[in-house]
Amino acid sequence: MTLKPIRLRPEAELEIEEAFDYYLRESPRIAGRFLDEIASSLKKIQRDPQLYPAYTKNTRRRILGSFPFSVIYQEREEIILIVAIAHAKRREGYWTKRLKQ
C-alpha cells in the first residue's frame, strides 16, 4: 500500500510553531511532547486517513489526546492536506477559508 504524502498549509505550520513556542516558554519537556504528539498524529492520519470522523467542509478531524488541539485535514486524490492545527478555544471553522485557496 502506497501512503499519500502529507502537505501542511502554511497556516497550519505556523499554528504548530506558535503552540510549540508557547509550550517551550512553559517547559521544554512539554514542548517536546507536543511535537511528538503532532508527529504521531500525522503518521496515524497518513496510515489510515479514513480512521478519524468526518468533520465539516469535506474534512476530517483528529483530536489530540494530551493537548487542546485538533488536526483538521482533507484527503485529496494525491495528498493529505493538513488544513489547520486548531486550538479548542478558537472560533469553530475559522480555517474554512483555507479550503478555497
Per-region residue spans from a language model:
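Short, hydrophobic secondary-structure boundary micro-motifs
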Residues: 32-33, 53-55, 94
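Basic/aromatic recognition patch in beta-strand/loop cores that engages polyanionic ligands
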Residues: 40, 47-80
